[in-house]
């Protein structure tokens, strides 16, 4: 496409830029970033999303087309795909805006797989992955006889605990795992709908039950709190505890009315919290429709994007199975449809789509960045952890 566009006469490109690729309300150029996306009004006229928001009534969302005065509502607008495709076709020949250059400069680099460990037998149908912030050890929960397996940072020296059984301290069906700042392992157990905390030697420290209907995703905050999603109740909880003493200090519901929330992640840079929802659409598989919501540290919604919105930007279907933040505050998701790892950009830029890994994965289900900026991906199809290194200078 870039070569074809390069052969287009400059005057035609300029004419297209002025006549077709510019919002005639604010005279800003259309783009793929959220505020500049071209939106079709029901009458056929096209304006940018920022102008739709500015023209719409704050409560009723009613607006009039600025050109023909036909009434409609903001929710009646849709992405103008011909303009988006034209932007893609002529992208390399258009004059890059400073904002676009800034966005490109902070995008993460390309990733290359340079190590893998685990494999069938060592791991069996793994579901969750975490890193110990102090030691760099890798913790995985899976369907083996002992549910929790701990590797050293290089993938060797594994030890395990968390017997499969019916006792209160056993782990029946682990869904996710996290490691606290003081090296305690936190597991969500769907078998008895509880949250279980172990020390690194496998001694049970705390069991939190009854508060959850189906605890799923778990993550640790910078202040050593525990974030837990409840997929059945549609909630996000924050737990604070004295882990060495095994005492639960308090539990707070941060969000309600979420739709089947599973994965959760927190940015240590900004304090933002990302929640991965699996909305159940009537007559469709819930696993094929996903949505990422990002809240700031005050739990105000600052960005969201769903499978439908992503599929307008990306040539193949995206089904998010896991979410995390990189060290720059970008939201990163695992895609099981690709399979791939995709950067969605910062929440205020949603969706600034950038594929990071498109080869070497079968079914990625969990992600975590190391302090050295390597990316660990849990691949449930190959029952292994794959380590990708950020190749600085290959991105952008």
From Swiss-Prot:
PROSITE patterns the UniProt entry points to: NHL, ZF_RING_1, ZF_RING_2
EC number of this enzyme: 2.3.2.27
Family matches, as InterPro entries: 6-blade_b-propeller_TolB-like, NHL_repeat, TRIM-NHL_E3_ligases, Znf_RING, Znf_RING/FYVE/PHD, Znf_RING_CS
Matches recorded under SMART domains: RING
Pfam families: zf-RING_5
Keyword Membrane among record annotations: no
GO cellular component: cytosol; endoplasmic reticulum; nucleoplasm; nucleus; perinuclear region of cytoplasm
UniProtKB keywords: Autophagy, Endoplasmic reticulum, Metal-binding, Nucleus, Repeat, Transferase, Ubl conjugation pathway, Zinc, Zinc-finger
A molecular-function term among this protein's GO annotations: ubiquitin-protein transferase activity
Pathway(s) annotated for this protein in UniProt: Protein modification; protein ubiquitination
Catalytic activity: S-ubiquitinyl-[E2 ubiquitin-conjugating enzyme]-L-cysteine + [acceptor protein]-L-lysine = [E2 ubiquitin-conjugating enzyme]-L-cysteine + N(6)-ubiquitinyl-[acceptor protein]-L-lysine
Start-end of each NHL repeat: 110-154, 158-201, 202-242, 245-298, 299-347, 348-391
Major localization class: endoplasmic reticulum
EC category name: transferase
Protein origin, superkingdom: Eukaryota
Compartment(s) where it occurs, according to its Swiss-Prot or TrEMBL record: Endoplasmic reticulum; Nucleus
Function: E3 ubiquitin-protein ligase. Together with the phosphatase EPM2A/laforin, appears to be involved in the clearance of toxic polyglucosan and protein aggregates via multiple pathways. In complex with EPM2A/laforin and HSP70, suppresses the cellular toxicity of misfolded proteins by promoting their degradation through the ubiquitin-proteasome system (UPS). Ubiquitinates the glycogen-targeting protein phosphatase subunits PPP1R3C/PTG and PPP1R3D in a laforin-dependent manner and targets them for proteasome-dependent degradation, thus decreasing glycogen accumulation.
Domain notes: The RING domain is essential for ubiquitin E3 ligase activity.
Oligomer and partners: Interacts with AGL. Interacts (via the NHL repeats) with EPM2A/laforin. Forms a complex with EPM2A/laforin and HSP70.
The protein's name: E3 ubiquitin-protein ligase NHLRC1
Organism of derivation: Rattus norvegicus (Rat)
């Amino acid at each position: 496409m870039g070569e074809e566009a390069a052969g287009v006469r400059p005057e035609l490109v300029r004419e297209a830029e002025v006549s077709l690729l510019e919002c005639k309300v604010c005279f800003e150029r259309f783009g793929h970033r959220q505020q500049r996306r071209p939106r079709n009004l029901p009458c056929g006229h096209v304006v940018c999303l920022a102008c739709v928001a500015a023209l719409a009534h704050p409560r009723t969302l009613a607006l009039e087309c600025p050109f023909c005065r036909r009434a409609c509502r903001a929710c009646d607008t849709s992405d103008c795909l011909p303009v988006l495709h034209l932007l893609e076709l002529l992208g390399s020949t258009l004059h890059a805006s400073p904002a676009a250059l800034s966005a490109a400069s902070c995008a993460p680099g390309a990733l290359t797989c340079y190590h893998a460990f685990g494999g069938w037998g060592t791991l069996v149908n793994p579901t969750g992955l975490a890193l110990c912030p102090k030691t760099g050890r890798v913790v995985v929960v899976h369907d083996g006889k002992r549910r929790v397996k701990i590797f050293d940072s290089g993938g060797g020296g594994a030890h395990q605990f968390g017997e499969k059984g019916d006792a209160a301290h056993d782990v029946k069906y682990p869904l996710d795992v996290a490691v606290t700042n003081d090296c305690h392992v936190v597991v969500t157990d769907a078998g008895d709908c509880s949250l279980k905390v172990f020390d690194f030697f496998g001694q049970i420290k705390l069991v939190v039950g009854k508060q959850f209907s189906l605890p799923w995703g778990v993550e640790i905050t910078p202040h050593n709190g525990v974030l837990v999603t409840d997929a059945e109740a549609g909630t996000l909880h924050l737990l604070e505890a004295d882990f060495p003493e095994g005492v639960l200090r308090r539990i707070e519901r941060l969000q309600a009315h979420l739709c089947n929330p599973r994965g959760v992640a927190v940015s240590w840079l900004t304090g933002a919290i990302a929640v991965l929802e699996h909305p159940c659409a009537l007559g469709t598989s819930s696993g094929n429709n996903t949505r990422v919501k990002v809240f700031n540290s005050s739990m105000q919604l600052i960005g969201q994007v769903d499978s439908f919105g992503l599929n307008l930007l990306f040539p193949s279907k995206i089904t998010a199975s896991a979410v995390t933040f990189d060290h720059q505050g970008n939201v990163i998701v695992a895609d099981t449809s690709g399979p791939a790892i995709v950067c969605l950009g910062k929440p205020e830029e949603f969706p600034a789509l950038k594929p990071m890994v498109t080869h070497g994965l079968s079914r990625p289900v969990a992600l975590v960045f190391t302090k050295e900026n390597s990316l660990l991906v849990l691949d449930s199809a190959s029952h292994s952890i794959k380590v990708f290194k950020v190749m600085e200078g290959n991105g952008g």
